[in-house]
Amino acid sequence: MSRVSQARNLGKYFLLIDNMLVVLGFFVVFPLISIRFVDQMGWAAVMVGIALGLRQFIQQGLGIFGGAIADRFGAKPMIVTGMLMRAAGFATMGIAHEPWLLWFSCLLSGLGGTLFDPPRSALVVKLIRPQQRGRFFSLLMMQDSAGAVIGALLGSWLLQYDFRLVCATGAVLFVLCAAFNAWLLPAWKLSTVRTPVREGMTRVMRDKRFVTYVLTLAGYYMLAVQVMLMLPIMVNDVAGAPSAVKWMYAIEACLSLTLLYPIARWSEKHFRLEHRLMAGLLIMSLSMMPVGMVSGLQQLFNLICLFYIGSIIAEPARETLSASLADARARGSYMGFSRLGLAIGGAIGYIGGGWLFDLGKSAHQPELPWMMLGIIGIFTFLALGWQFSQKRAARRLLERDA
């Protein structure tokens, strides 16, 4: 086996262990934020939505800067610094009794993610061969689902005693992850050339096809982020107990572990990436619309199952499509910018979703936020379809002219 192949194989195992630590640290804390501050402390959902949206927007919106800096200086220093910063954010969250302190803790957490997330994504693109990326992203998603359940179960158990224990556990896991990267991650370059920060960012901004695709995905993310805000609140309201939230993540884990990899393997042989992304988005959108009209936990979990199936179909295709469009000369910048759709969609989804949830509750129209999210998903589906049809038309025109 050549040294390059050996490095790739070892890199896969490193990425999987690193991903598990990050997922556990994140899901111990974040799914319980809405339960802690809305249900237990009586805050308005929009206040918590602002905090979650702030974290999302900072982490993903500034990702292009984190990626461009990593292109220049390498992945290791950015990843270690970012993970320690997230640990500090979680420690601060444990003592948050005023909205401003929760917002500050989410700001710290988001800045940490800005530093470590783009270089981690770029390492996947660097180490995994193009023909293997779809399957590897599926493995990461399966791991995400299992880690989400374990993290949510651990966090729910700790929440019975003290929310500070929840946050301390998340902080410790990120400190461990920082130590793991500091000890074992080689000083790898992310790009084929050492790209100056400004040049990497400029290269991305001039790629109009990539920019349009990323911004359109904001609508997709408005739906996806509700697993952190409105769906846990809805499950808690219907069940009457925060402990039911862990079953929501258990459903995701069961579906992901049994269906994600087989669906990815089968669909990559029969369907284009864009068709898989659009099909998953359509299922997610349609499953959102009736959520506000259900009154039983079984009905709600059925819709959540449908939502997760849509995500299982869409997410590996979205990740693979984003990676395939990235320029190898500025991988960090591209993967950082690819998070901008999540920044915009996540911020609007959290803040707008929280506001619509409060509005629907006060107006005795609980279906309002869910119908709006479904409509947004349908419009995003149509916009993606138009983009992909334009790309195919341009390709056919070039082939004919040739």
UniProtKB/Swiss-Prot annotation:
Q: How does it sit in the membrane?
A: Multi-pass membrane protein
All ranges on the Cytoplasmic side of the membrane: 1-12, 117-138, 186-213, 265-276, 321-339, 389-402
Entry annotated with the keyword Transmembrane helix: yes
Coarsely, its chief localization is: membrane
**Cross-referenced InterPro entries:** MFS, MFS_dom, MFS_trans_sf, MFS_Transporters, Multidrug-R_MdtH
Keyword Transmembrane (UniProt): yes
Q: Which residues lie on this side of the membrane: Periplasmic?
A: 34-98, 160-164, 235-243, 298-299, 361-367
Record field: transmembrane: 13-33, 99-116, 139-159, 165-185, 214-234, 244-264, 277-297, 300-320, 340-360, 368-388
SUPFAM superfamilies registered for this protein in UniProt: MFS general substrate transporter
Q: Which UniProt keywords apply?
A: Antibiotic resistance, Cell inner membrane, Cell membrane, Membrane, Transmembrane, Transmembrane helix, Transport
Q: Which GO terms describe its molecular function?
A: transmembrane transporter activity
Localization in the cell: Cell inner membrane
Question: Single Gene Ontology BP term?
Answer: response to antibiotic
Q: Which Pfam families does the annotation name?
A: MFS_1
Q: Which GO terms describe its cellular component?
A: plasma membrane
List the PROSITE patterns hit by this protein, alphabetically.
MFS
Among HAMAP family, the record links this protein to:
MFS_MdtH
Family the UniProt entry places it in:
Belongs to the major facilitator superfamily. DHA1 family. MdtH (TC 2.A.1.2.21) subfamily.
Concerning PANTHER family, the annotation shows:
MULTIDRUG RESISTANCE PROTEIN MDTH, RESISTANCE PROTEIN MDTM, PUTATIVE-RELATED-RELATED
NCBIfam families with a match to the protein in the record? PRK11646.1 (NF008650)
Protein name in the entry: Multidrug resistance protein MdtH
State the species of origin: Escherichia coli O9:H4 (strain HS)
Gene label: mdtH
